[in-house]
Curated annotation (Swiss-Prot):
It comes from the Eukaryota. CDD domains: delta_zeta_tubulin-like. The lineage of its organism: Eukaryota, Metazoa, Chordata, Craniata, Vertebrata. The gene is TUBD1. This is Tubulin delta chain. Belongs to the tubulin family. It comes from Macaca fascicularis (Crab-eating macaque). PROSITE patterns: TUBULIN (PS00227). It is found in: Nucleus; Cytoplasm; Cytoplasm, Cytoskeleton, Microtubule organizing center, Centrosome, Centriole; Cell projection, Cilium. One of its GO terms (cellular component) is cytoplasm.
Length: 453
């Protein structure tokens, strides 16, 4: 089944390019770990999901690109065409000559309604090209104006017009130190609206990805391109094909549906994170060897201690003993002793994958009491390696991972709101104080729900 990607704003378009490039690069890499027939099936499954094909055989991304300024879209189209491996559709873009000025209200209340018909028409045409349609993957930032404001508007429209299709939003959490003075306002408005209209929010924190680039990839001067390539690697490791069952020789046909089924059992809990191992520079990789036991031990402890990468894991964090109340349940006033999960999915790719032991992820102590571990944990496998790694593991998790960052953004936004700072920039475009109050209420409920797991 095919996925239509909607790339919104500078952030969404730059990441979208890296994702498609990573997917196609991986699917055409020469892997010595599986037979030719299996490799061809893998390539065909990847293409069906993310690409259509021109008569001359050039793959075309199943994507719609939206921005209110032409510069980034033109750069994105050019980079894809210059790759020689794939390109975007000739009529898959919508751009204007006036941005949203980092104002969520302008993106949501002005640009969104003004260009609704044109944007939704492009999306409809892309959906109609799919023989079998799985849903939408929407890539956007949370803190700006175009990606966040128009992103929230478009997602709401997709929910209205494609209510039976799945919608997953990949959102970029802003740096804690701040890129935009009103980023906390933009963030709470984005999140509260997406929580009503999206089926799942796949969250990447800029601070965490920046640390991966610095500490694991050993990059000295980190660019947005470096960060976006890490994001693309993580997303590719989730969305590339895996077997539907250990005994099956058929790749999963409905990636979005399978992800939602396993990871979002209740509409109150939609926040998903990605952790992957290993992640390192080419130079380090040449001198490294990996075992499944070692990779999974690190991945499990990253989950328990809420670590975003292998380096600096807190090995003292432990789940409570089964049957005992957790002394380390999340409290906003205390350190995170233990990260409780609702659901976890481990995806394993590479050599000897059938020998990997994932029993440690089935421990009932890892999960909230209202879900049986048999329903809360799933594993997908394929012996075909991903990217440059002979063995790799990725964890997609619905857990308490975002409680502290979310509470921090809500509190910062509330402090600004209480002093009426910059409110006029929003009210003049139709976002009233009541809209802010609704957003605060909605997100405070999300924080409380995750805290009480």
């Amino acid at each position: 089944m095919s996925i239509v990607t909607v790339q919104l704003g500078q952030c969404g378009n730059q990441i979208g390019f890296e994702v498609f490039d990573a997917l196609l690069s991986d699917s055409h890499s020469s892997q010595g770990l599986c037979c030719k027939r299996e490799n061809e099936a893998y390539q065909a499954s990847c293409k069906e999901r993310f690409f259509s094909e021109e008569e001359n055989g050039v793959p075309i991304a199943r994507a719609v690109l939206v921005d209110m300024e032409p510069k980034v879209i033109n750069q994105t189209l050019s980079k894809a065409a210059q790759s020689g491996r794939w390109k975007y559709g000739q009529h898959a873009c919508f751009c204007q000559k006036q941005g949203s000025g980092n104002n969520w209200a302008y993106g949501y209340s002005v640009h969104g309604p003004r260009h609704e018909e044109s944007i939704m028409d492009l999306i409809r045409k892309e959906v109609e090209k799919c023989d079998s349609f799985s849903g939408f993957f929407i890539i956007m930032s949370m803190a700006g104006g175009t990606g966040s404001g128009i992103g929230a508007f478009v997602t709401q429209n997709l929910q209205d017009q494609y209510s039976n299709s799945l919608k997953m939003n990949q959102i970029i959490w802003p740096y804690g130190t701040g890129e935009v003075i009103v980023q906390n306002y933009n963030s709470i408005l984005t999140l509260s609206h997406l929580y009503r209209s999206s089926d799942a929010l796949l969250v990447h924190e800029n601070d965490a990805v920046h640390k991966i680039c610095a500490k694991l990839m050993n990059i000295k001067q980190i660019s947005f391109s470096d960060i976006n390539q890490v994001l693309a690697h993580q997303l590719g490791s989730v969305f590339q094909p895996t077997y539907s069952a250990e005994s099956s020789f058929h790749y999963r046909r409905n990636p979005l549906g399978d992800l939602m089924e396993h990871l979002v059992p209740h509409p109150e809990f939609k926040m998903l994170s990605i952790r992957n191992v290993p992640h390192m520079s080419e130079n380090s990789l040449a001198y490294s060897t990996f075992t499944w036991a070692g990779l999974l031990k690190h991945l499990r402890q990253m989950l328990i201690s809420n670590a975003k990468m292998e380096e600096g894991i807190d090995w003292h964090a432990r789940p409570p003993l089964s049957g005992l109340p957790s002394l380390g349940k999340m409290s906003l006033n205390k350190d995170l002793h233990f990260n409780t999960s609702i659901a976890n999915l481990v995806i394993l790719r590479g050599k000897d994958v059938q020998s990997a032991d994932v029993e440690g992820f089935k421990d009932p102590a890892l999960y909230t009491s209202w879900l049986e571990p048999v329903n809360a944990f799933n594993v997908w496998k394929t012996q075909r390696a991903f990217s440059k790694y002979e063995k790799s593991a990725v964890l997609v998790s619905n857990s308490q991972f975002l409680v502290k960052p979310l509470d921090m953004i809500v509190r910062k936004a509330w402090n600004m709101f209480a002093s009426k700072a910059y409110i006029h920039q929003y009210t003049k475009f139709g976002i009233e104080e009541e809209d802010f109050l609704d957003s605060f209420t909605s997100l405070e409920q999300v924080v409380a729900s995750y805290c009480n797991l």
